[in-house]
Amino acid sequence: MADSDNTPTSRKDFETAIIAKAWKDPEYLRRLRSNPREVLQEELEALHPGAQLPDDLGISIHEEDENHVHLVMPRHPQNVSDQTLTDDDLDQAAGGTGIGVVVAVVAGAVANTGAGVNQVAGGNINVVGNINVNANVSVNMNQTT
């Protein structure tokens, strides 16, 4: 759910905002198709100034048409290893709300850096900073409480 100023606070909100922008703005859609990494980096920085997508992160855009529907199958939680947050990471997340961007064609289990860990597909993973990434692409956003 987006907060009162329409800032996305969940994966669904983030994806919806990008899709709506692409449908309204042909130039934005063109840029999203030709350089999704650049566009997602801009959107991420708008939400979390200074946040960076990992250099080795692959990003793909998959458009549906009348003959194709894309189902994102999350990574099995048994294939996700736990990572630990440093004290600095916890300090950055002290505000209690963080949006984790998981970019994954095959998705991935996700947990936000925030006041707790969210579970997706039964797996926990903590990553550094306000973004969560499990290589490949499709954007996941979660809100901590």
From Swiss-Prot:
Organism superkingdom: Bacteria
Propeptide residue interval(s): 1-96
Post-translational events: Epimerization of most, and perhaps all, L- to D-amino acids is catalyzed by PoyD, when PoyA and PoyD are coexpressed in E.coli.
GO molecular function: catalytic activity; transition metal ion binding
Classification via Gene3D superfamilies: Nitrile hydratase alpha /Thiocyanate hydrolase gamma
Residues modified to (3R)-N4-methyl-3-hydroxy-D-asparagine: N126, N134
Residues recorded as bearing (3S)-3-methylglutamine in the entry: Q119
Keyword rRNA-binding among UniProt keywords: no
PTM annotation (3-methylvaline): residues: V101, V103, V105, V117, V127
In-chain residues carrying the UniProt-annotated modification D-asparagine: N140, N142
Role this protein plays: Antimicrobial peptide active against Gram-positive bacteria (MIC=4->125 ug/ml). May act by forming transmembrane ion channels, since the peptide rapidly depolarizes the bacterial cytoplasmic membrane, simultaneously decreasing the membrane potential and intracellular potassium contents.
Miscellaneous comment text of the record: The name 'proteusin' is inspired by Proteus, a Greek shape-shifting sea god.
Protein name: Polytheonamide B
Species this protein is from: Bacterium symbiont subsp. Theonella swinhoei (strain pTSMAC1)
